[in-house]
């Protein structure tokens, strides 16, 4: 069976840390494909200002264009309504019913997962892969370990922990650094840097 993981996020902007995690998921877990899913109108960030969805999609597209096992979907970007994870998973399960679907996200999301819409459907439609993110407690901390076990027991699911080396950078830090005029070339694919410079983003 083909195994694919949806890697959802605002990707504002996509950076080398995202790409590093996607590589780790492919090679450590034997996945066939990572589908990057830039969010269109995420409910948890409805009140926050984020870069235009089509620009974020374009940055992901150019960042991964040379990677044979990476693809990018405009499914959520093209939606005019709020983007919910369960809805996206339902769509892709219907589209590729014989594919085994996974959802790749930060381990910190486990702490708020039960606030997500139709969380029971989410765990029915996919298997979760979680990874550590900079600025959040390590996955081995007691609170996240307890939450992992609680979710697994409650929803009869198995959450996979991707124990990958941490790339210490975040999109927030990159945006702030660009605003302050700092060099961020090391943290981004060259193609993404070019878009940011050409369109004067994050100033």
UniProtKB/Swiss-Prot annotation:
The keyword NAD applies. The lineage of its organism: Bacteria, Bacillati, Bacillota, Clostridia, Eubacteriales. It catalyses: nicotinate beta-D-ribonucleotide + ATP + H(+) = deamido-NAD(+) + diphosphate. It comes from Clostridium kluyveri (strain ATCC 8527 / DSM 555 / NBRC 12016 / NCIMB 10680 / K1). Disulfide bonds: none annotated. It is an enzyme of class 2 (transferase). Pathway: Cofactor biosynthesis; NAD(+) biosynthesis; deamido-NAD(+) from nicotinate D-ribonucleotide: step 1/1. Keywords: ATP-binding, NAD, Nucleotide-binding, Nucleotidyltransferase, Pyridine nucleotide biosynthesis, Transferase. Catalyzes the reversible adenylation of nicotinate mononucleotide (NaMN) to nicotinic acid adenine dinucleotide (NaAD). Belongs to the NadD family. SUPFAM superfamilies: Nucleotidylyl transferase. This is Probable nicotinate-nucleotide adenylyltransferase. Its EC number is 2.7.7.18. GO terms for molecular function: ATP binding; nicotinate-nucleotide adenylyltransferase activity. GO terms for biological process: NAD biosynthetic process. It comes from the Bacteria. InterPro entries: Cyt_trans-like (IPR004821), NadD/NMNAT (IPR005248), Rossmann-like_a/b/a_fold (IPR014729).
């Amino acid at each position: 069976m083909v195994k694919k993981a949806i890697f959802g996020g605002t990707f504002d902007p996509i950076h080398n840390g995202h790409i590093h995690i996607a590589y780790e998921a492919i090679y450590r877990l034997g996945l066939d494909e990572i589908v990057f899913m830039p969010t269109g109108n995420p409910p948890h960030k409805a009140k926050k200002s984020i870069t235009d969805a089509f620009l974020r999609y374009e940055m992901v597209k150019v960042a991964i264009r040379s990677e044979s096992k990476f693809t990018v979907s405009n499914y959520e970007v093209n939606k005019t309504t709020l983007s919910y994870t369960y809805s996206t998973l339902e769509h892709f399960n219907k589209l590729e019913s014989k594919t085994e679907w996974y959802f790749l996200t930060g381990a910190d999301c486990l702490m708020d997962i039960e606030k997500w819409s139709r969380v029971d459907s989410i765990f029915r439609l996919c298997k979760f892969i979680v990874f550590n993110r900079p600025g959040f407690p390590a996955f081995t901390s007691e609170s996240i370990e307890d939450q992992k076990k609680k979710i697994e027991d409650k929803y009869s699911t198995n959450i996979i922990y991707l124990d990958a080396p941490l790339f210490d950078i975040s999109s927030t830090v990159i945006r702030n650094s660009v605003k302050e005029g700092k060099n961020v070339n090391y943290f981004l694919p060259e193609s993404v840097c070019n878009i940011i410079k050409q369109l004067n983003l994050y100033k």
